[in-house]
Regions:
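Residues forming the flavin
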Residues: 1-233
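N- or domain-start disorder-to-order transition segments that initiate the globular core
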Residues: 231-272
Length: 272
């Protein structure tokens, strides 16, 4: 059986070097229940992957009932559909795909295809933001960015020092500068900045989204493909010639490869 604690928060995680237990606190009665465990999972709701839209200089807007930022206006010729546009249920995503495809066809001068979105079960998505668990200092640190161990105290100190702009907070605290580039923690930091300054999240805004997200052609991932699939290599005009001549290719960084040597017959590296 799985016990569900409603109207409650994880107030503290106990353990040294590893998790040993959590303290769950009722939001209304403040009663504490301790549960032995070795792992704590957490969820921040659904956050659309808006990185490519942002890199294309597109703007974002905050949607209160989704508690997240979604694409607003596009500058370049890009269209967002489905979950990437804030349509988080299956029915919404399917309908979004249909409508945006019609728009795309129109923009490139093709006739609209008359079809209907597939039927799907009616779903509802709801979320209530909780930017910080309202507990006393005795419970220790409250982490916002799990990647870089950024806490609410770090954000408070940044604002106290006059770094209240979201770009300044990012650099003062290193929030959102881990290998996930803010994918897991940025919305928490923005929400906390807003809470501290009495602003809404749209007034706080976002930082510029960067890699690890980069465009990739559908041809790279569609259908049968030999060789690298997860991270396809880039090619120069002479790449095919090198491969045809039997070159042993070395990685050269940024998804490029260069010929290391051209073996003849059964030659190894030293012989070649």
């Amino acid at each position: 059986n799985v016990t569900v604690f409603s109207d409650s928060v994880v107030a503290k995680v106990n353990g040294y070097k590893r998790v040993k237990s959590v303290e769950i606190m009722s939001s209304s009665t403040k009663k504490i229940v301790i549960i032995p465990c070795d792992l704590v999972g957490h969820s921040g709701g659904w956050n659309p992957t808006v990185h490519l839209h942002s890199q294309a200089r597109g703007s974002l807007r905050y949607v209160l009932n989704l508690a997240t930022f979604i694409p607003d206006k596009s500058i370049q010729k890009s269209l967002c559909i489905g979950a990437a546009s804030g349509k988080l249920t299956l029915g919404e995503a399917l309908y979004s795909g249909l409508e945006v495809s019609k728009q795309a066809l129109k923009e490139i001068g093709l006739k609209e295809i008359h079809t209907e979105a597939p039927n799907s079960t009616l779903e509802k998505y709801s979320i209530e933001p909780l930017w910080q668990v309202g507990v006393s200092k005795k419970f220790g640190k409250s982490f916002l960015d799990i990647q870089n161990d950024v806490t609410t105290d770090d954000v408070d100190l940044a604002i106290l020092e006059g770094y209240s702009n979201v770009e300044h907070v990012k650099r003062y605290t290193t929030g959102g500068m881990g290998i996930d580039q803010g994918k897991t923690g940025n919305i928490n930091i923005i929400g906390t900045i807003a809470l501290r300054q009495g602003l809404n999240l749209e007034e706080v805004g976002t930082t510029t989204f960067r890699s690890p997200f980069s465009p990739i052609s559908f041809g790279s991932i569609g259908g049968l493909r030999e060789g690298s699939v997860v991270l396809p290599y880039r090619h120069t005009p002479i790449t095919k010639w090198n491969l045809d001549k039997g070159a042993f290719m070395y990685e050269a960084g940024a998804r490029w490869r260069r010929p290391g040597y051209f073996p003849m017959m059964d030659e190894g590296f030293q012989d070649a």
